């Protein structure tokens, strides 16, 4: 079986996924025009799926792929929520000024004004789903001694629907309150985001919860024990099988699209070359634009569940966000005086089975007062290692909620 790539996005919900666990790749059979992605022959009626509009994916897909590649340098499995990360950084941007503002705008690829309008629309769109669960929550927790500007609090409440909490960061109970909020907003999938409030003056948090059934569920009787060639050796997995209508192929990869309800979809992507790979080399944008309904696509997707946690400081520093993390250069005067970012904690969860997908993410931006900044510790990114990636996308835009790379699957 080829190593697989599952690159899944959510508000651009797309998960790249698995194929042929035994044949070594996809091939076209001229006589029947069947794209073989697995050995098992599943005869299923394939519903004509809508084509994802060729909107400009380039900036979002390239940025997201690069982020996963950076985090994947030290990990097998990487799962990130671009949606959650961007929403949390957007709330920080609202209080940023000077060069700190410019660096955040460059990463988000929007001005402060454009970003505000954009995120308000995302929150409205999340409310308009009918057959899936897509829940977005924001909050600001700040120390009782910190003088946060009323204009900033009002902006978060009115535009990000944020919950504002003035708390005692010296009280150990505050940690429990913050973690309970995260647990509640993610339906207990992410029960904890911080372990201590020492040296923390404020925390900006985005929480995201997604649960969707497949438009056409996998037939449970077709799920078989098959071999997945992971980075740490072969492992037996529960491989789901179906026949899909949308085929993807470019110079670097093949793939398929399987739809959820309400215009979300899972995109499975299999690199043509076996072994380690970088997402940035696969041209995800071009692959999505290559979609065709000329074939029946026989696919295999392993059931999997992944929990992931990392600090984003090192990766975002490589994207040019520097002043925000420097106590001597950070400018968040729109929030309060002398604040700088001490950490950006990102946790995700995803589970994929015959019924559908459940996923959650929490991004917490912790800030401290530069006047009392402790000595900066070395930042370590804790992630997994290779060979497949994933994302979840909405089929009419390019907003990325979740994406990742999976190389080992625990049973």
Named regions from a protein language model:
Residues 1-2:
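N-terminal hydrophobic targeting signals that begin at the initiator methionine
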Residues 5-8, 13, 18-169, 406:
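Detector for small/aliphatic-rich hydrophobic stretches
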Residues 75, 118-272, 292-374:
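Non-catalytic, conformational "gating/processing" segments within enzyme and secreted inhibitor domains
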Residues 76-78, 254, 387-390:
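Short loop/turn microsegments at loop-to-beta-strand junctions
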Residues 100-102, 275-278, 308-310, 360, ...:
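Extracytoplasmic/secreted cell-surface and envelope-processing proteins
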Residues 271-293:
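Internal alpha/beta scaffold segment
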Residues 346-348, 354-411:
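C-terminal soluble interaction/assembly domains
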């Amino acid at each position: 079986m080829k190593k697989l790539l599952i690159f899944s996005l959510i508000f651009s919900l797309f998960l790249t996924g698995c194929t042929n666990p035994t044949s070594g790749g996809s091939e076209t059979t001229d006589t029947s025009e069947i794209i073989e992605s697995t050995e098992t022959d599943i005869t299923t009626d394939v519903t004509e799926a809508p084509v994802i509009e060729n909107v400009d994916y380039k900036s979002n897909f390239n940025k997201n792929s690069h982020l996963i590649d950076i985090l994947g340098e030290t990990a097998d499995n990487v799962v990130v929520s671009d949606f959650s990360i961007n929403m949390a950084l957007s709330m920080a941007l609202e209080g940023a000024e000077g060069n700190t503002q410019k660096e955040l705008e460059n990463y988000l690829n929007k001005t402060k004004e454009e970003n505000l309008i954009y995120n308000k629309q995302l929150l409205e769109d999340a409310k308009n789903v009918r057959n899936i669960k897509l829940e977005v929550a924001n909050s600001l927790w700040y120390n009782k001694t910190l003088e946060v500007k009323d204009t900033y609090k009002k902006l978060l409440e009115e535009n990000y629907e944020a919950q504002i909490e003035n708390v005692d960061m010296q009280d150990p109970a505050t940690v429990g309150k913050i973690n309970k909020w995260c647990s509640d907003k993610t339906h207990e999938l992410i029960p904890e985001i911080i372990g201590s409030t020492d040296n923390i003056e404020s925390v900006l948090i985005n929480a995201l919860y997604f649960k969707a059934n497949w438009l056409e569920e996998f037939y449970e009787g077709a799920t078989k024990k098959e071999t997945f060639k992971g980075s740490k050796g072969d492992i037996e997995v529960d491989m789901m099988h179906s026949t899909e209508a949308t085929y993807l192929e470019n110079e670097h990869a093949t793939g398929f699209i399987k739809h959820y309800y309400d215009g979300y979809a899972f995109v499975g992507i299999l690199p043509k070359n076996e072994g380690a790979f970088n997402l940035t080399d696969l041209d995800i944008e071009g692959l999505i634009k290559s979609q065709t309904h000329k074939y029946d696509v026989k696919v295999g997707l392993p059931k999997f569940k992944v929990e992931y946690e990392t600090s984003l400081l090192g990766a975002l520093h490589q994207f040019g966000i520097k002043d925000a993390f420097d106590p001597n250069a950070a400018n968040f005067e729109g929030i309060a005086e002398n604040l700088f970012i001490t950490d950006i904690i990102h946790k995700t969860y995803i589970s994929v089975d015959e019924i559908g997908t459940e996923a959650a993410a929490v991004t917490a931006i912790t800030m401290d007062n530069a006047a009392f900044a402790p000595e900066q510790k070395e930042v370590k990114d804790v992630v997994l290692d290779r060979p497949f990636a994933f994302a979840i996308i909405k089929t009419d835009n390019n907003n990325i909620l979740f994406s990742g790379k999976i190389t080992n699957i625990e049973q």
